[in-house]
Amino acid sequence: MDFAIRPYQPSDLPALYRICLQTGDSGADATGLYSDPALLGHFYAAPYAVLEPELCFVLVSDGAPCGYILGTRDTAAFRAACEREWFGALRDRYPLPLESDQSRDAAMVCLIHRGHDAAAAFPEHPAHLHIDLLPHAQGGGWGRALMTRFLETLRAAGVRGVHLGVGARNVGAVKFYQRMGFHSLSEGSGALWYGMKLET
């Protein structure tokens, strides 16, 4: 298989939704866990690609997307942009579920209504990112290559630091972030937060 990294194109959006779902259970396939396959992508992938496409890079294998890295240079500004331009239509489409609904779909709909958590902001690390690769794209150095491309783009924009969140069960991802030079910032509710200062 031939792999390559390229900038995001709007035609990639359905693939981003698919990859987000297929890696959405702490790195494992979450397809069977959600009735609505778009919910994860509505929160964790699509708004970044739509609102900050210049920070979205796609890994392709024989021309087909199989991974991505995306994020924002300024978490606070991104949160505000999502409130203005992204979540409104989704909140209309997905009403708040009943409290008795304990499904994963309901949890994601509640997250869409709550929006991005202000408590997850780290002032010294204003940017944040998400990276997901399908299993056949892992282990060949492409995750590192995507991360390097993203971090270089942040540095060129003068961003001083970046953070990310990862499920505590996603041991492989935690090791990858540590190898990339990320350090622990915080933890809680099954999530770990890592950060990296960027020299510009």
Where are these regions (language model features)?
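Conserved N-terminal entry element of GNAT/NAT acetyltransferase domains
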Residues: 1-11, 200
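Conserved GNAT-fold acetyl-CoA-binding loop/helix
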Residues: 25-44, 80-95
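Active-site rim helix/loop that mediates acceptor-substrate recognition in acyltransferases
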Residues: 34-56, 62
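Conserved beta-strand in the GNAT
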Residues: 58, 64-73
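Conserved acyl-donor/pantetheine-binding loop and adjacent beta-alpha core of acyl/acetyltransferases
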Residues: 75-130
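Conserved catalytic-core motifs of GNAT/GCN5-like acyltransferases
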Residues: 76, 163-165, 178-196
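Conserved GNAT acetyl-CoA-binding A-motif
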Residues: 125-127, 154-167
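Conserved acetyl-CoA-binding loop-helix of GNAT-fold acetyltransferases
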Residues: 130, 139-153, 175-179
